[in-house]
């Protein structure tokens, strides 16, 4: 089925998200995207000292290899940013579609993606190429000397400004929203596959109680 091939292509296109952490060995610590004071633990790393300080049940920060923490943070930021776009897209597509029947016949986001991949294979190829281009450009920027983890050198709105304290708060908001979005988009996909309802569709059909109403999973 074309959908399986398309998913495989998209995975290859985003493979640089999992490049070995050794690439960060030569990257000097800077405050470009994260004010990090890293040693052999996450102490001082933005986002590691709130709610559950030093929360690391899997031990990623226990004597990591050189450059590993930067790699972990870059991967976390990348996935968080993608998840924020994905979660927003799940909601937007319930209200707006491109003027093509293949985009507008399903209210279920995941089902719509499968339909697009099967009926508009070139659209899936375009998605894959766009992902590859973003990864290649981002990787080139990330590899610059002195570039901090997650700093892609792209700030068209000049959000960084000149106040480091304000910028660190903005970084923390991005990190926490990204973490929440990763949980949210996972829950949205699970909900759709278990109940048959997308997020907005569930509210429209009053299918918001998962227990005993004949519409939820239980």
Swiss-Prot record:
Print the keywords alphabetically. Chlorophyll, Chloroplast, Chromophore, Membrane, Photosynthesis, Plastid, Thylakoid, Transit peptide
BP GO annotations: photosynthesis, light harvesting
Which molecular function terms from Gene Ontology are attached? chlorophyll binding
Transit sequence range: 1-36
Record-linked Gene3D superfamilies? Chlorophyll a/b binding protein domain (1.10.3460.10)
Q: List the disulfide bonds.
A: none
Q: Which domain of life is it from?
A: Eukaryota
Q: Where in the cell is it found?
A: Plastid, Chloroplast thylakoid membrane
Q: Name one GO cellular component term.
A: chloroplast thylakoid membrane
> Entry's InterPro entries?
Chloro_AB-bd_pln (IPR001344), Chloroa_b-bind (IPR022796)
Assembly and partners are described as: The LHC complex of chromophytic algae is composed of fucoxanthin, chlorophyll A and C bound non-covalently by fucoxanthin chlorophyll proteins (FCPs). The ratio of pigments in this LHC is; fucoxanthin: chlorophyll C: chlorophyll A; (0.6-1): (0.1-0.3): (1).
Q: Which family does it belong to?
A: Belongs to the fucoxanthin chlorophyll protein family.
Q: Any idea what job this protein has? A: The light-harvesting complex (LHC) functions as a light receptor, it captures and delivers excitation energy to photosystems with which it is closely associated. Energy is transferred from the carotenoid and chlorophyll C (or B) to chlorophyll A and the photosynthetic reaction centers where it is used to synthesize ATP and reducing power.
Q: Per its record, how is this protein called by name?
A: Fucoxanthin-chlorophyll a-c binding protein, chloroplastic
Origin species, per record, is Chattonella marina var. antiqua (Red tide flagellate)
